[in-house]
């Protein structure tokens, strides 16, 4: 199981986790799904200014170029950043996965990706295995350093591992108190796959949940900060999204407090299997 290298209870520094390929990935980053170009640039710049070094985008978001502009404007050395993007469903395939990777690099204005993910498995399409094989080739050519998947179930993950003899470094999935993905996280631990959580606030639905607001008040924190912290304390990597720069910085400020076991358990008790986004087994979009 992946383990957070360092978390200092009195520090705002964002620690890293070691992936199964020995790359180091920040445990908390910014996602830019559904943000306009203007919102993307302002959010990325705010995140970078606040110390964030993990930026997560996707070809289907349509804002890779905006991410690239913000990175360039920040002046932060490339080697200090961890940039993730994702392969769109319409580009799945051995050769098209490699071509799409290079197209994403062109839009981002980068020479390599830190992490490249299959965005959605689209099992009915039947191309996720050959797509992953194409990503292996892209890694061999130096276009990407780590490769992984997103929205993969236990069975789909097992198929990729069995048919390619390659263990994805990361599986990025919807994960929040209503959908804690406990069984999937156990499978990840068995294979040394890092669990990365998106939609940690349940698309905003959980910030008014009484259990969460009560705990937040006790710690003098926002509900969003408590939800992000809960996810981190499960040893997950987290990407959180906001179009408001002040919220971006606020959601990153979660490394100077620790939730007590009883509060972790109370939040865990909210699990009911509710998925607020798409079903990975049937979704054919993006």
UniProtKB/Swiss-Prot annotation:
Belongs to the aldo/keto reductase family. Its EC number is 1.1.1.-. It comes from the Bacteria. This is Aldo-keto reductase MAV_4483. NADPH binds at residues 201, 203, 239, 241-242, 247, 251. Keywords: NADP, Oxidoreductase. It is an enzyme of class 1 (oxidoreductase). The keyword NADP applies. The active site is at residue 61. Coiled coil: none annotated.
């Amino acid at each position: 199981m992946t383990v957070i290298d360092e978390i200092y209870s009195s520090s705002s520094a964002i620690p890293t986790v070691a992936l199964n390929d020995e790359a180091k990935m920040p445990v908390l980053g910014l996602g830019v799904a559904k943000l306009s170009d203007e919102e993307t640039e302002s959010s990325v710049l705010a995140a970078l200014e606040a110390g964030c070094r993990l930026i997560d985008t996707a070809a289907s978001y349509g804002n890779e170029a905006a991410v690239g502009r913000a990175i360039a404007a920040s002046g932060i050395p490339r080697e200090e950043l961890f940039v993730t993007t994702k392969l769109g469903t319409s580009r799945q395939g051995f050769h098209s996965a490699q071509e799409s990777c290079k197209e994403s690099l062109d839009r981002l204005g980068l020479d390599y990706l830190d992490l490249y993910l299959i965005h959605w498995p689209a099992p009915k399409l039947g191309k996720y295995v050959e797509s992953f094989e194409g990503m292996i080739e892209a890694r061999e050519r130096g276009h990407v350093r780590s490769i992984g998947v997103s929205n993969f179930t236990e069975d789909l993950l097992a198929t990729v591992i069995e048919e390619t003899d390659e263990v994805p470094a990361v599986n990025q999935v919807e994960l929040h108190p209503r959908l804690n993905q406990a069984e999937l996280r156990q499978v990840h631990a068995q294979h040394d796959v890092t669990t990365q959580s998106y939609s940690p606030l349940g698309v905003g639905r959980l910030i008014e949940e009484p259990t969460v607001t009560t705990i937040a008040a006790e710690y003098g924190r926002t509900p969003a900060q408590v939800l992000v912290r809960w996810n981190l304390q499960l040893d997950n990597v987290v990407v959180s999204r906001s179009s408001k720069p002040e919220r971006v910085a606020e959601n990153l400020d979660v490394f100077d407090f620790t939730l007590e076991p009883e509060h972790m358990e109370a939040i865990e008790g909210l699990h009911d299997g509710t998925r607020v986004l798409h079903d990975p087994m049937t979704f054919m979009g993006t």
